[in-house]
């Protein structure tokens, strides 16, 4: 829950001086990106902006405290303030902030600006007490905010110092409205107005001016002088002389003498006790001070001018002026030291009663009450964990003695999940092992089962599927049906283990079960994970269309639950890119890979390795080797500076080896082959992929026999495990092996198998990257006119893709080629005496490449009837009667010119 008072603009008080000259300057705030109000404490920053904000509707107010250095807390309140200003316009951002479903503050702000693009009225966001922010991540995020905020939004920041928000740049670009302490200082006229409304007996203008000069227009000093004068301790001028030259850090003695010592003991204790509250209402005051009618007491303190201010229009919430509040808290530690723990306990109990466990934890920590802290955590820790209050939980658990954790194993489990969320896998197992060894009376087997579910998740994350399987099975055997979270975890882990072992059908069933349970209990990140795993399994089985449909369900879940900022979103767009690439939808595949990189923009560059490999695959499929080389340099740098799962390494190696094949770089392939890992098994798609990389390198080096052994074993495993997509890839590589080894009939046999299997997988680009060797074989198959209709159509489509992206390898009938051909001593006399036109040579090249008449017309952007005329003319000039004869004639010409076809 968010504390309402932190989102309420302070109420404009009746006896404050209206700062007309400053309000006039602020009237043009909408022309600036940032309005910055800076001064030491007590110069009236908040009062001024509350006056300016009066009557404005499109304004959000966020009052900071020290706890707002937690990024998640800062995000929640800031988005809530924007929602307040826009009447709930940014619903997606609000949900993302509430559920902590964003990768970083900057990515959350980017989504906010997308939603605000539809908001066209002027909009203001006030952030008060920004000097309390010390978290550099928040500073950087707010710099991003200011750089990219909509033109109709003005950010108003109040701070005691110059914040780290890129102020100099804004000032140069005239996008900054500044008001500092010199402008905030009261003028003689304002000081006179102030005393006139505060004192029963007015003072002369000259006296008022001297007092104002003595304290340099400091508003807090003027307020203290008025308070002293009302209490008749001594003259206003005497107070002014005493305050002259005193700054906020030296006020303690003065405040003791002039404020605390001039109120009765009951009021003194009320002030000291209530000051421990960062914000307060009737219930909190009654519980903390022990006085009845807390609201009336607060209003009485307000009337006495004791630096208390209302925080909302209803008058329910109050807080002390920061300067006075800090002073009172220090005095409370000195004067009520013995009572202070009990006061904090009372505050914690009252916050709990009002449903604010995070505030209660703050006071339980201050009280040093481990038992109270334990009880709060037992009741609310998992809710705080699910809302990503990780820093607060970690601080709280550290404050508990180890014996208290042992007596409450749920808290040990919580601490372990905190470690797991921070990828401290080794510490998780150490903590759980120590706890199980020392816990004397653990409840039945349930807690052991929860420990094992977490251990299983750690094991699979750490690349140990056998241990993960053992632990997940133990957990599922012992967990009661109602312990849904750990059951979801264990079921998901077991499904992932089976996926790794190639038991795809069983894995798919478990992932579907995980999805169902996760949806039932609103555990959305596991629901998304299970859908991604289902898609990968279906892809491996060769059911790419069903994999696509499963991905669509995952995208829908992301949109419905606003999960766009989760790192898992990158996983989804990456496997979508892989599927699009397989279907030769290269522009869409590249766009998906780039969106994956964008999702991970706030993470370490190593996390982008997989998407970068996908971009390289797109370049390779297009035949764009220059771009591929540039991207490979970055990929190889990332490989050398990180530790990766075998799946990641396999995908990175794949694009490297294909690039070496396309460029004929045998030295690089040989060096890689000497050092690369050779997996013990090949029972899943990433192990199959690594062995396929090895076989491709061996083929490039002419090591046909060991490559054939590898590929035959891969095919045997793929067939037995129904890894149909891997089988399709293996057949294509085996085809290249046979072709280069001169075993043409074997090459044709496996190519026919690959084409048939592609009717299921839909593969196109896997054929295309094999380039000219593949094109030659497909042309021959098309010429034989024996392919079934589906295979014939696919072969023609593959040839079109090769022609589009690799034309330099085989479309040889350009002007230079024709000139050399006509000057060749062995050129047929018929061609020499009746030469083809340049257009007819182009048509012959496209016929040779396997294009139909309609496709040739589309390629050359002419009418189909025009193409028929060109074909009729070139047939006559070549002395051929049909297409197959024209292809054979073109083949003879290419051989004569030294092209291997």
Swiss-Prot record:
CDD domains (UniProt xref): LuxR_C_like
PANTHER family: DNA-BINDING TRANSCRIPTIONAL ACTIVATOR DEVR_DOSR
Residue ranges flagged as DNA-binding region: 853-872
Domain HTH luxR-type span(s) in chain numbering: 829-894
Residues that hold ATP according to the record: 39-46
Species annotation: Escherichia coli O139:H28 (strain E24377A / ETEC)
Activity: how regulated: Activated by ATP and maltotriose, which are both required for DNA binding.
One Pfam family this sequence matches: TPR_MalT
Family of this protein: Belongs to the MalT family.
Name used for this protein in its record: HTH-type transcriptional regulator MalT
Nucleotide-binding listed as a keyword: yes
One Gene Ontology biological process: positive regulation of DNA-templated transcription
Function, in words: Positively regulates the transcription of the maltose regulon whose gene products are responsible for uptake and catabolism of malto-oligosaccharides. Specifically binds to the promoter region of its target genes, recognizing a short DNA motif called the MalT box.
Assembly: Monomer in solution. Oligomerizes to an active state in the presence of the positive effectors ATP and maltotriose.
GO MF, one annotated term: DNA-binding transcription factor activity
Gene encoding the protein: malT
Residues passing through the membrane, by range: none
Keyword Oxidoreductase: no
Swiss-Prot/TrEMBL keywords: Activator, ATP-binding, Carbohydrate metabolism, DNA-binding, Nucleotide-binding, Transcription, Transcription regulation
């Amino acid at each position: 829950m968010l504390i309402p008072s932190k989102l309420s603009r302070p109420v404009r008080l009746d006896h404050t001086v209206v700062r007309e000259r400053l309000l006039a300057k602020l009237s043009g705030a909408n022309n600036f990106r940032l309005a910055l109000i800076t001064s030491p404490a007590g110069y009236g920053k908040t009062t001024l902006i509350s006056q300016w904000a009066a009557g404005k509707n499109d304004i959000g107010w966020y009052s900071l405290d020290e706890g707002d250095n937690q990024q998640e807390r800062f995000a929640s309140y800031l988005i809530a303030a924007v929602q307040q200003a826009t009447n709930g316009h940014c619903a997606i951002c609000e949900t993302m902030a509430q559920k902590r479903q964003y990768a970083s503050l900057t990515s959350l702000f980017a989504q906010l600006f997308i939603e605000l693009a539809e908001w066209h009225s002027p909009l203001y966001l006030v952030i008060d007490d920004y000097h309390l922010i010390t978290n550099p991540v928040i500073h950087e995020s707010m710099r991003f905010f200011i750089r990219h905020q909509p033109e109709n939004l003005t950010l108003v920041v109040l701070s005691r110092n110059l914040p780290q928000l890129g102020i100099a740049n804004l000032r140069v670009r005239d996008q900054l409205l500044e008001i500092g302490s010199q402008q905030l200082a009261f003028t003689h006229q304002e000081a006179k107005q102030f005393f006139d409304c505060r004192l029963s007996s007015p003072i002369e203008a000259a006296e008022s001016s001297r007092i104002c000069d003595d304290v340099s227009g400091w508003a807090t000093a003027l307020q203290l002088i008025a308070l002293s004068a009302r209490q008749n301790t001594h003259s206003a001028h005497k107070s002014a002389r005493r305050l002259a030259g005193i700054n906020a850090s030296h006020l303690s003695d003065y405040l003791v003498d002039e404020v605390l010592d001039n109120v009765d003991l009951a009021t003194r204790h009320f002030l000291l006790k209530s000051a421990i509250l960062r914000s307060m209402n009737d219930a909190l005051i009654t519980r903390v001070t022990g006085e009845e009618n807390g609201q009336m007491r607060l209003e009485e303190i307000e009337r006495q001018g004791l630096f208390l201010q209302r925080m909302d229009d209803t008058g329910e919430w109050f807080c002390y002026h920061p300067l006075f509040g800090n002073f009172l808290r220090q005095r409370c530690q000195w004067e009520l030291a013995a009572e202070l723990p009990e006061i904090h306990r009372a505050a914690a109990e009252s916050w709990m009663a009002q449903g604010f466990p995070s505030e209660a934890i703050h006071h339980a920590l201050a009280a040093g009450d481990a038992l109270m802290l334990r009880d709060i955590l037992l009741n609310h820790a998992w809710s705080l964990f699910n809302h990503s209050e990780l820093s607060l939980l970690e601080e709280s658990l550290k404050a508990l003695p180890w014996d208290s954790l042992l007596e409450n194993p749920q808290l040990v489990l919580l601490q372990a999940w905190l470690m797991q969320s921070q990828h401290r896998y080794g510490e998780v197992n150490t903590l759980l092992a120590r706890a199980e060894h020392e816990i004397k009376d653990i409840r039945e087997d349930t807690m052991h089962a929860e420990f094992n579910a977490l251990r299983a998740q750690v094991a699979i994350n750490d690349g140990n599927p056998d241990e993960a399987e053992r632990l997940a099975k133990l957990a599922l055997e012992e967990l009661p049906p109602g312990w849904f979270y750990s059951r979801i975890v264990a079921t998901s882990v077991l499904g992932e283990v089976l996926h790794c072992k190639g038991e795809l059908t069983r894995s798919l069933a478990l992932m579907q079960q995980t999805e169902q349970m996760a949806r039932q209990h609103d555990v959305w990140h596991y629901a998304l994970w299970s859908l991604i795993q289902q898609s990968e399994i279906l892809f491996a089985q060769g059911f790419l269309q069903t994999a696509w449909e499963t991905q669509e369900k995952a995208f829908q879940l992301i949109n419905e639950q606003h999960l766009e900022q989760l790192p898992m979103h990158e996983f989804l767009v990456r496997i979508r890119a892989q599927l699009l690439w397989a279907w030769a939808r290269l522009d869409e595949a590249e766009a998906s890979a780039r969106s994956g990189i964008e999702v991970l923009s706030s993470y370490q560059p190593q996390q982008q390795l997989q998407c970068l490999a996908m971009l390289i695959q797109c370049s390779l499929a297009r035949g764009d080797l220059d771009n591929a080389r540039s991207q490979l340099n970055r990929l190889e740098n990332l490989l050398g500076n990180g530790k990766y799962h075998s799946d990641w390494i396999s995908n990175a190696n794949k694009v490297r080896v294909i690039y070496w094949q396309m460029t004929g770089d045998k030295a690089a392939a040989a060096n890689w082959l000497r050092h690369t890992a050779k997996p013990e098994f090949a029972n899943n798609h990433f192990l199959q992929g690594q062995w396929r990389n090895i076989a491709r390198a061996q083929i490039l080096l002419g090591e046909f026999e060991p490559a054939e052994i590898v590929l035959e074993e891969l095919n045997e495993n793929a067939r037995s495990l129904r890894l149909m997509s891997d089988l399709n890839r293996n057949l294509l590589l085996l085809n290249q092996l046979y072709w280069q080894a001169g075993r043409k009939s074997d090459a044709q046999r496996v190519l026919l198998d690959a084409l048939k299997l592609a009717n299921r997988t839909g593969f196109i680009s896997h054929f295309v990257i094999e380039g000219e060797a593949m094109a030659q074989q497909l042309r021959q198959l098309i010429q034989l006119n024996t392919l079934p209709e589906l295979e014939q159509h696919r072969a023609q489509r593959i040839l079109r893709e090769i022609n589009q992206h690799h034309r330099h390898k085989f479309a040889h009938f350009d002007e230079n080629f024709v000139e050399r051909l006509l000057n060749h001593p062995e050129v047929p006399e018929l061609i020499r005496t009746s030469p083809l036109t340049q257009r007819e040579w182009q048509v012959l090249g496209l016929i040779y490449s396997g294009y139909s008449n309609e496709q040739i017309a589309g390629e050359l952007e002419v009418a189909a009837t025009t193409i028929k005329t060109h074909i009729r003319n070139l047939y006559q000039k070549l002395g051929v009667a049909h297409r197959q004869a024209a292809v054979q004639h073109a083949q003879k010409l290419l051989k004569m010119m030294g092209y291997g076809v």
